[in-house]
């Protein structure tokens, strides 16, 4: 796995995570049948990163976009917890420019926009298991070209804290 500055940090055990959002996602990932937790990290800014492998993704034999049946992702939770946890596809050759990818000042890792709902609107009822399922849904639907509604213009956002439609 390639190292990316945005998710690099000191490796920590999952049981040593400190941020409530990271802890809930870590625990949900451990219980999820399609997820294997590979590692956890703490960055110098206090954010925490969970590296996971998603498996048994529902990818057709000839996908619309080159998405694999297994994909590695990183979920980064910020200390302030004001925005949706950041989700990155961390495969070295993961395609850029897919629908519902966030425009960032770097090409890789690819930042995924997994929800078009503002985090402030869902934060009170945030469910880590549902969050993981949204990520899986992103891969499954993008692989068949159905993540983005037909006839709806793509919206480009240049900051991960915005939402995409």
What are these regions (language model features)?
Residues 95-152:
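Glycine-centered motif in EGF-like
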């Amino acid at each position: 796995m390639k190292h990316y500055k945005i998710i690099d940090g000191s490796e920590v055990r999952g049981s040593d995570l400190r941020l409530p959002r990271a802890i809930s996602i870590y625990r949900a990932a451990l219980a999820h049948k399609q997820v294997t937790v590979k590692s956890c990290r703490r960055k110098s800014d206090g954010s925490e990163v969970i590296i996971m492998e998603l498996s048994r993704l529902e990818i057709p034999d000839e996908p619309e976009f080159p998405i694999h049946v297994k994909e590695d992702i990183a979920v980064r939770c910020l200390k302030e917890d004001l925005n949706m946890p950041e989700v990155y596809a961390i495969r070295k050759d993961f395609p850029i420019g897919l629908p519902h990818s966030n425009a960032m000042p770097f090409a890789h890792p690819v930042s995924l926009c997994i929800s078009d709902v503002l985090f402030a609107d869902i934060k009170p009822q945030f469910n880590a298991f549902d969050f993981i399922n949204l990520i899986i849904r992103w891969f499954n639907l993008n692989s068949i070209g159905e993540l983005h509604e037909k006839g709806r213009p793509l919206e480009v956002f240049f900051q991960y804290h915005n939402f995409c439609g």
